[in-house]
């Protein structure tokens, strides 16, 4: 019984963490983050650092697999951040 309660508690904490990072648009995210994900599950994610996954910036600020790169980095053709 204690194990079941513990599992439920951990599950609830995980769900609360997921919901707290949820976003609908770029305005929902803090500086240094973008709103990225599928239509039903978008989360605020940090901009890509050197060698990390990225998506090129676009005028709609719509990103599905990753954020644009941090300043002074560019998103390469293989969707990895690299020095500009």
Curated annotation (Swiss-Prot):
Keywords, in A-Z order: Disulfide bond, Secreted, Signal, Toxin
Annotated Gene3D superfamilies: Lipase, subunit A
UniProt-recorded Gene Ontology molecular function terms: toxin activity
InterPro entries in the cross-refs: Prokineticin_domain
Residue stretches spanning the membrane: none
Residue ranges the record marks as coiled coil: none
Entry comment describing in which tissues the protein is expressed: Expressed by the venom gland.
Pfam families reported for this sequence: Prokineticin
GO cellular component: extracellular region
Secretion signal span: 1-21
Disulfide bond sites: 23-35, 29-44, 34-67, 54-75, 69-81
Chief location bin: secreted
Compartments (UniProt record): Secreted
Keyword Secreted: yes
Family membership noted in the UniProt record: Belongs to the AVIT (prokineticin) family.
Protein name listed in UniProt: U8-theraphotoxin-Hhn1f
Organism: Cyriopagopus hainanus
Source organism phylogeny: Eukaryota, Metazoa, Ecdysozoa, Arthropoda, Chelicerata
């Amino acid at each position: 019984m204690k194990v079941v309660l513990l599992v439920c508690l951990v599950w609830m904490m995980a769900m609360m963490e997921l919901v707290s990072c949820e976003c609908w648009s770029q305005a929902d995210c803090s500086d240094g983050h973008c709103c990225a994900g599928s239509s039903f599950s978008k989360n605020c994610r940090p901009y890509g650092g050197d060698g990390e996954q990225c998506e090129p910036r676009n005028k709609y600020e719509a990103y599905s697999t990753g954020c644009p790169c941090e300043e002074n980095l560019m998103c390469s053709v293989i969707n990895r951040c690299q020095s500009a």
